[in-house]
C-alpha cells in the first residue's frame, strides 16, 4: 500500500525542529526506500548561510514553499567563470541542470522542497568554495565524494573546510574564504516576484 501524501504545513508543525544548521534539511523521502525509486526529497529550512557550492551529476528540482531564497550558481564553461544569483520566490519552481555549481542560500523563516533524481552508483558529488575576492574568484578548495547520505556527508565536508585555515586560504591571492556568509552580506529577494 502506498503512503498518504505529505502535508507540508502539518509536517512542519510537528518536525520543524529537525531543520538544523549547518545543512538545515530533512529527507522526507530517502533514496534507499523501495517506494522512492532512488529519488531524494528534502524539506529545507532557513536560515542557511553556507558559502560552499555543490555539484550534483543529476538535475535538482527546487520548490519554494514559504518565503524566498537565493540560488547562487556558477557557469564554469566560460572564462572567467560567470556567477549568477537566481531568486526563487514563494510558490516558485526551478529546475537546476545537472553539474551546475550551486549554493542555495536560505533566509530565516523560509521553507523549500528539493528533489534530486537518482545518481549512478559511482557518481561523485563535489563541494567547492570560490575565492571571495571579486578580482580572483578561483576555486579555494574542493572535495569529491560518492554521496550516500547527503545530510551527514555535506555537514562533514563543511566542518572539515571550516576547521582548516589552509583549506580556506586561496592559493592564487591569499584571501581567506569563510564557511558562512556574514550577517547582512546577502540581501533576501522579495517574498514574491515584482509585478
UniProtKB/Swiss-Prot annotation:
Entry keyword NAD: no
This enzyme's EC code(s): 1.13.11.6
Metal-binding listed as a keyword: yes
SUPFAM superfamilies: RmlC-like cupins
GO cellular component: cytoplasm
Entry keyword set: Cytoplasm, Dioxygenase, Iron, Metal-binding, Oxidoreductase, Pyridine nucleotide biosynthesis
Binding residue positions for substrate: 60, 106, 116
GO process annotations (BP): 'de novo' NAD biosynthetic process from L-tryptophan; anthranilate metabolic process; L-tryptophan catabolic process; quinolinate biosynthetic process
Catalyses which reaction(s): 3-hydroxyanthranilate + O2 = (2Z,4Z)-2-amino-3-carboxymuconate 6-semialdehyde
Domain of life of the organism encoding this protein: Eukaryota
Annotated residues for binding of Fe cation: 54, 60, 102
Entry's Gene Ontology molecular function annotations: 3-hydroxyanthranilate 3,4-dioxygenase activity; ferrous iron binding
Cofactors that this protein relies on: Fe(2+)
Amino-acid positions noted as binding a divalent metal cation in the UniProt annotation, renumbered to this chain: 131, 136, 170, 173
Gene3D superfamilies per UniProt: Jelly Rolls
Protein's pathway: Cofactor biosynthesis; NAD(+) biosynthesis; quinolinate from L-kynurenine: step 3/3
EC primary class: oxidoreductase
Localisation: Cytoplasm
Binding, O2: 50
Pfam family, one: 3-HAO
Functional note: Catalyzes the oxidative ring opening of 3-hydroxyanthranilate to 2-amino-3-carboxymuconate semialdehyde, which spontaneously cyclizes to quinolinate.
NCBIfam families noted in UniProt: anthran_nbaC (TIGR03037)
Family per record: Belongs to the 3-HAO family.
Protein name from the UniProt record: 3-hydroxyanthranilate 3,4-dioxygenase
Organism annotation: Aspergillus terreus (strain NIH 2624 / FGSC A1156)
